[in-house]
Curated annotation (Swiss-Prot):
Disulfide bonds: none annotated. InterPro entries: TatA/B/E (IPR003369), TatA/E (IPR006312). GO terms for biological process: protein transport by the Tat complex. It is found in: Cell inner membrane. Its main location: membrane. Residues 47-67 have a biased composition (Basic and acidic residues). NCBIfam families: PRK02958.1, tatAE. This is Sec-independent protein translocase protein TatA. Belongs to the TatA/E family. The gene is tatA. Keywords: Cell inner membrane, Cell membrane, Membrane, Protein transport, Translocation, Transmembrane, Transmembrane helix, Transport. GO terms for molecular function: protein transmembrane transporter activity.
Length: 67
């Protein structure tokens, strides 16, 4: 009794579509997808900066060794 069956989820989905409409749900999906994309892009930019700093440190050490 604690878990929902497939028919329960279908009924819930139909009720949600009737209440909000497909256009509003589509907009929510686009907004959520954009937020996830921006979040992942921000994470990638953060790691790129760290890798660039490591490369700079390595190059700086090589320059010191040559001098």
């Amino acid at each position: 009794m604690g878990s929902f069956s497939l028919t329960h989820w279908i009924i819930v989905l139909i009720i949600v579509v009737l209440i909000f409409g497909t256009k509003k749900l589509r907009n929510v999906g686009k907004d959520l997808g954009g937020a996830v994309h921006d979040f992942k892009q921000g994470l990638n930019e953060g790691t790129d900066g760290k890798e660039a700093q490591k490369d700079d440190v390595i190059e700086h050490k090589k320059d010191e060794d040559k001098a």
